[in-house]
Regions:
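Non-catalytic alpha/beta scaffold blocks inside enzyme catalytic domains
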Residues: 1-189
Length: 190
C-alpha cells in the first residue's frame, strides 16, 4: 500500500548499506559528474558550503540547476566571471543551464523553519509576496502538475510514480501546509 513500491531506492554500497546522500556527499557526486541536476530551495551552497571552490566546480558539471530564491544569490549566479574566477574558469566553460524561480522570502510565507542549532519553529506570513514570487510548496506543486500533465500527454521513463500520485489537496496548484501536515502525520480514514 501507500505506493512505497513506486519510490526510488537509494543505491547500496558494496557492504549493502544505503549510500550517503547528505550535503557533502551529494556535492561530491556532482563534482565527479554523477548527477545531472539540482533543485536548490532555501539554500545557497556556493556561499554556505564547506568548500566553495569545489561547490562551484560541482555546479559547473550539472546539466541543469533550478534555484528558487527571492533574489539572485551566489548559487544562481555561479556561472558569472567573478565566481568562476575562483576555479580558474570562465562562463564559456560552464554548460549548466540555470533556471531562477521567484520565491517568497521568510516573511512572505507560512511554514516551519529549522536551523543548525536544531530549533524548529512555525510562523505565519506577514505580507503577500510581490510580483510572481510564490511560496515553495506552490512552486513544487506547479512543477509536479506540469510534469504529470507532460507524462500523461507524451509518456516517458517510469511514469507510474508520477501518474499514480494522489494529489488530493483542495487547491492542487498551491497546497495548504495544514493539509500537507495532516498527510505526513496521517489521519483516520473511517
Amino acid at each position: 500500500g501507500f505506493g512505497y513500491d513506486l519510490h526510488p531506492r537509494l543505491p547500496q554500497s558494496a557492504e549493502g548499506a544505503d549510500e550517503n546522500w547528505s550535503w557533502a556527499y551529494m556535492f561530491d557526486r556532482m563534482y565527479r559528474g554523477d548527477m545531472e541536476g539540482l533543485f536548490a530551495f532555501g539554500m545557497n551552497p556556493v556561499s554556505n558550503g564547506p568548500h566553495s571552490k569545489k561547490v562551484v566546480s560541482a555546479l559547473s558539471k550539472l546539466k541543469w540547476l533550478v534555484v528558487a530564491e527571492n533574489f539572485e544569490q551566489e548559487t544562481a549566479a555561479f556561472w558569472r566571471d567573478d565566481i568562476q574566477a575562483l576555479v580558474d574558469q570562465t562562463p564559456a566553460d560552464v554548460a549548466t543551464e540555470v533556471f531562477m524561480l521567484p520565491a517568497a522570502n521568510f516573511a512572505e510565507k507560512d511554514g516551519a523553519f529549522v536551523n543548525s542549532a536544531r530549533w524548529i519553529q512555525w510562523k505565519w506570513k506577514a505580507v503577500d509576496p510581490p510580483g510572481e514570487a510564490r511560496p515553495d510548496q506552490e512552486i513544487i506543486a506547479r512543477i509536479f502538475l506540469a510534469v504529470r500533465e507532460l507524462y500523461a500527454r507524451e509518456g516517458g521513463v517510469h511514469p507510474a510514480p508520477v501518474a499514480a500520485l494522489d494529489w488530493w489537496y483542495s487547491n492542487p496548484a498551491s497546497p495548504s501546509l495544514d493539509e500537507a501536515a495532516k498527510e505526513i502525520n496521517g489521519w483516520a480514514t473511517e
